[in-house]
Amino acid sequence: MTRPDSGQPATSPAGARPIDFAELRGPVVRQVGQLMAGAAMTAPKSGGQLLTAGSPAFLETVLVEDPTTLLRLAEWMRARGAERREAIWFRDADAAQALDGVLFIGLVNPYPPNYDCGACGYATCAEFLHATKQQRADSAELEFTGPTCTLRNVDLGVAVGSAARTAALHCVDARCQTRIAVAARKLGLIHADLAVALSLSLTHKAITFDRRMPDIDYDALTLASTETLPVAVPGAIRADGARNKQQPRQPTPRRTRRPPAANP
């Protein structure tokens, strides 16, 4: 230990032990990450009585804190950013390498709660499952699998919020992200169809905030394909609300103006 004001070795009275910051980070993040996972698991869920009746749990929690694994996540994210031509993937990849850990919370085979609420656009849960079965199977090549029951998406949000609150109570910096979750899913670290990552760090300044977007020369990159859709291609039609031109699997029809109605 050194004194921050002088750079000289710190001295302590007999019986007092200075706290080594480097030794503190790992154990604290590990313990708080486990508490966060517990908070996610006990968070309220739609149709919770199904779980007490023996239905399988659909919420997955995975804690990653190994630097080698964090590097694998970062490298995949850079490859994904190259094929989507989006600098934000590179920005998040740089942060991933510097994290003390990541808690992934996701939905695995999230069956509906049988409320027949209609929020998905179908009259019943059974109708939703039947109508979207092939669509879910076809979405394996996308970043996440879908569509997912709307109420289960709400459940995921509640679980993530409970976990984030637990991190805040213990003063561990946490930020909700999806790109790291995509990387974890594609690398087989998690099995969730849809997931959110909570980036964890114990530093003097939160490393996942106030980050600048890097300048990337995409044409100079030679990164392997992630075999994930969509990807950026020249000439792709920018869909309404899209940030970049990504190639959809189904062509997006161009909107045309309706001719003015003739005066009677």
Language-model-derived ranges and their functions:
Residues 2-264:
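Acidic, surface-exposed loops and disordered segments
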